[in-house]
Amino acid sequence: MLVVNNPLVLREQISLWRREGRSIAFVPTMGNLHQGHLTLVEQARSHAEKVVVSIFVNPMQFDKAEDLANYPRTLEEDCAALNAAGVDLVFTPTPEIMYPQGLASQTFVEVPGLSGLLEGALRPGHFRGVSTVVTKLFNLVQPDVACFGQKDYQQLALIRKMVADMAMPIEIVGVPTVRAEDGLALSSRNGYLTTAERALAPELARTMNWIAEQIEGGDHHLPSLVAQASQRLDNAGFRTDAIDIVDATTLESATDKSRHLVILMAAYLGKARLIDNRVVMLSA
């Protein structure tokens, strides 16, 4: 497995594979890898002959300097796991390499509409940072396929729209959320949980599933369901950040005609901000 941080070296290797007629799959990450990331790698391997993974803690998508500074960096362990998973190349650039003129002078990419909704409204600038860094990584790696987790539902929708709008010749593969046995969605941020908080954390998924069951059972008074779910989380020790039930395609408010919904959950438990989602299909 090659580990490189120089974009020129990366491009040389990509060009070599292209001359050999190899297909390339790409998995962008911020490191601190867990089984969810390795599942993305497995999916990537099934779609192409060569797999490239990037590890880059992207400062452009953090709205708090403290969060950026505290984000776990476990490069040695990550590379060992990726090597064992059969990855062909790991790209590990620094912020100075990715943004040589600094963030203030960096050209950015922004997807209108989706960038300002929901999570984007709570974290201004976050999705601008995501779309910019993903575009730059796509330009460097030039993959045929890129794999993203469905746990970050809005991010996946944003990447799909960006790729379509910009006519990028890349297939975007959404990979189902990987969960612990108790239902908690795997996330690098789970490492912020204390032992006691980790025991409480599955309540987020349980509450989400409760909402889905109510909707599927015929209760379509969504504001009431959101209020009850928020109270349920607060009673369990969470601090609810957002619960949204929206059209799964547009991510705009669901209407009486909406039949394809997604429940989007975000709540703090201690220092950790946990997110989850579930799609609900209603019969016509």
Swiss-Prot record:
Taking the record's annotation, the residue ranges forming a coiled coil are none
GO biological process terms, alphabetically, are: pantothenate biosynthetic process
Residues the record lists as binding (R)-pantoate: 61, 155
Cited SUPFAM superfamilies:
Nucleotidylyl transferase (SSF52374)
Q: Where does ATP bind?
A: 30-37, 149-152, 178, 186-189
**GO cellular component annotations of the record:** cytosol
Q: Which Pfam families match?
A: Pantoate_ligase
**Keyword entries, A-Z:** ATP-binding, Cytoplasm, Ligase, Nucleotide-binding, Pantothenate biosynthesis
Q: Which reaction does it catalyse?
A: (R)-pantoate + beta-alanine + ATP = (R)-pantothenate + AMP + diphosphate + H(+)
Molecular-function GO terms, alphabetical: ATP binding; pantoate-beta-alanine ligase activity
| Pathway(s) the chain acts in | Cofactor biosynthesis; (R)-pantothenate biosynthesis; (R)-pantothenate from (R)-pantoate and beta-alanine: step 1/1
Active site feature: 37
Main subcellular localisation:
cytoplasm
Compartment(s) of residence: Cytoplasm
- The UniProt record lists the keyword Cytoplasm: yes
Miscellaneous notes for this chain?
The reaction proceeds by a bi uni uni bi ping pong mechanism.
The task this protein performs is described as:
Catalyzes the condensation of pantoate with beta-alanine in an ATP-dependent reaction via a pantoyl-adenylate intermediate.
Q: How does it assemble?
A: Homodimer.
Family under the similarity heading? Belongs to the pantothenate synthetase family.
- Name of the protein this chain belongs to: Pantothenate synthetase
What gene name does this entry carry? panC
